[in-house]
Curated annotation (Swiss-Prot):
Gene it is expressed from: HIGD1B
Matching Pfam families: HIG_1_N
Topology of this chain in the membrane: Multi-pass membrane protein
Signal peptide start and end residues: none
Transmembrane segments: 30-47, 62-84
Name of this protein: HIG1 domain family member 1B
Source species taxonomy: Eukaryota, Metazoa, Chordata, Craniata, Vertebrata
Gene3D superfamilies, per database record: 6.10.140.1320
């Protein structure tokens, strides 16, 4: 017997997709920046596809992939540096509070 879809209500403890996205964005703000960078690179390279000249399609796609990965890795590195810096500042504040 199938459930009546009109009567289904999600549990109260579950977040909807937008709330989950906002929560994860607050926890790690550089992830959406990395995703945005990848999308911008992909959109730009698709736009430039028309004027690629004599470059082979496979080479053009490889360059697009490398540029998008560079944006993602850059965002990951910025996130790691931000986390290390914030942990360092918290530790310094705790050390100053103990003295």
């Amino acid at each position: 017997m199938s459930a009546n879809r009109r009567w289904w209500v999600p549990p109260d403890d579950e977040d909807c997709v937008s709330e989950k996205l906002l929560r994860k964005t607050r926890e790690s703000p550089l992830v959406p920046i990395g995703l945005g960078g990848c999308l911008v690179v992909a959109a730009y390279r698709i736009y430039r596809l028309r004027s690629r000249g004599s470059t082979k399609m496979s080479i053009h796609l490889i360059h697009t992939r490398v540029a998008a990965q560079a944006c993602a890795v850059g965002a990951i590195m910025l996130g790691a540096v931000y986390t290390m810096y914030s942990d360092y500042v918290k530790r310094m504040a705790q050390d100053a509070g103990e003295k």
